[in-house]
Amino acid sequence: QSAEVTYSWSKAETKTSNALKLHNMAGTNILSPNKFMDDEWNFVDVTAGPYGNVYALTQTGLIYEYDNSGNLLFSFGGRAVSNDRYGLFTSATAIDLDEEGFVYVLDKERGFVQVFAPTEFAMLNHRAIYDLEKGNYVESKKIWQEILRLNGMSKIAHIGYGKSLLR
C-alpha cells in the first residue's frame, strides 16, 4: 500500500456494487459509484504501484488500474476461453508489481505467472499525473502534450493538460 492511499475489497459470491474501495487520508471512498464500473464485483486481489496507483484483478482476468484519485487509467487482460493467448487467463488469482512497474499475474489453473511490461504510454501517464500532483506544472504540461500526440482521445490527458495550464 502507498502512504497516500488505502485500498480494500470485498470478495462477493453474488453481484454487488462498490466491491472495491479506495480511501483517501480523510477515510472517504474516492471510488464513488460514478467513477466505478458497477458490473465488476468479482475481485480476487489488489495491489498498489509505485505512484500510489491501485491495480485490481478480477477472477475473469480483467486488470483495472486506478490513479490515487480514483480515476480509471487502464484496463487490460481477460478470460481465455478456448485456447492459450498471452494476456488472457483461465483462473487469475493474484497480482503484484515491482518497483519498475512490471505487473505480475498468477494464473492458478495454468500454473504460471504472466508478466506485463509498462508501455511508454503508461509510463508517460504515470509521470504526468505525478508531476501534476507535485505542482510541477511546466513538466506535466509537456508530458500531457506528448500523451495527446500519441492518443488525442485520452480524456485523462485532456483533463491533466487543462489542469497544468491553471498554475
Regions found by a protein language model. Give the residues of each.
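Eukaryotic scaffold repeat domains enriched in small/polar residues
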Residues: 1-163
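Alpha-helical linker/edge segments of TPR/alpha-solenoid repeat scaffolds
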Residues: 166-167
